[in-house]
Amino acid sequence: MKNKSLAILSPLCLALYAAGAHAALEPFSFKASETIKHESNVNHEPDQFRNADWISNTEFLAALDQALGRSKLLADAGVNYNAYKKEDSLNSWGYHAGAELDWETIGDLNGAFGADTSRRRYIQGVTSDEIVFPNQPTPTPVTELNMQTDHHVFGRIRLGGPSRWQLFAGGDASRRSFSASNFHSNDERQWSANAGTRYATSPDLVFGLVGNYMRGEFPHVTVGSFGGVPIEVASKFRTRSVDGTVQLQASGSSMLDASVGYTTQTSDALAKEVKFVNGSMNWTWTPPSHFTVKVGLKRSSDVDTTTTAVNNGVRYSNNLNGPSINNLALLNVTYALTAKVNLDASASYSHRKYADVSVFDTGLGQNVLVDGTVRTTSFFLSAHYQPTRTTDLTCGAGREVRHGDATFAAFSYADNTVRCVAAIRFE
């Protein structure tokens, strides 16, 4: 592993040395990065089964930002390789690719459409949270290589341009699948649409109203077998919500982006209709000092809701949904020590609540209700050094703890991480 890591880092070091000599590459840009990290629980298993390991992640990215008259074409593609020092059976290639066309007409009509796809190793609590039901086929052990593939297409349209009054609408289609055959219960499809309006009373204050509708299939439940082949039924769900939004530039150093609304969800996997208040808040404060403070809050049914993207999925519903109600909180503080050195501290908390989830129990031959709560707390401290405009070096350490209390085998775990990342960009 040591020689492998050095071999990977060598070309990056040469690139860092030559960073100031490259010519402008517009409209293209490229990035290469190397991450070396140590985790005390690489598979996010229960504490009594955890294994520590060193992991190397090598990634190469290419991007395009091309103006096409009044429109713009954006595209990016990347490939990465994860290598484990001890558990080399988990070594894997991953990728990401996406394209988007931002268009506008002579009038105030504009929009965007595009697609993206990605593939990566599934890690419990990182890529998404699976649901483990009683007396269903045992999901793939987290120590087995299980690749998660996501596909997503979208379209947006807006009328109003920079004027005070805007009308907008959009739609998304998403699909997620897993490579392990006995993990297919977590495969998901989702279609969503949204429409709304915004009104700016001033350049610093914008109000909005948006409605969202989505339907999908999740989870897939085994209800029996025929000829030794499991019979799976896809649970269908529908979610409807209405949200009021506000964007406020309170001062030159304070920006608030918030929403509050009401959601109803029906699902074959739920014993009754779920109704709850949803919302989000992102507040950024940059006082006249070296500090930047960001606070995020969110309440939703997004199964993909993560602490690194608190506000995703409220305005544009492209996150996959699930049968849990999720509350999240995020705090991030950055201190600019010098023009090239930043210190960063972040903390997050998530609370997922499952109630009256109905699933077919193959042992009893009838539906049973399961419920529970999953709570995850994490923090990370890091230092970021930017020796040149196109080079970065970041090192840090953190800890994540999850507590599961449920009738569907939501186990607890803890993971300590130490990580360093070196990156170079060519623009």
What are these language model-derived features?
Residues 1-9:
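Bacterial N-terminal signal peptides that target proteins for export
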Residues 18-20:
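N-terminal signal peptide c-region/cleavage motif recognized by signal peptidases
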Residues 23-427:
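Gram-negative and organellar
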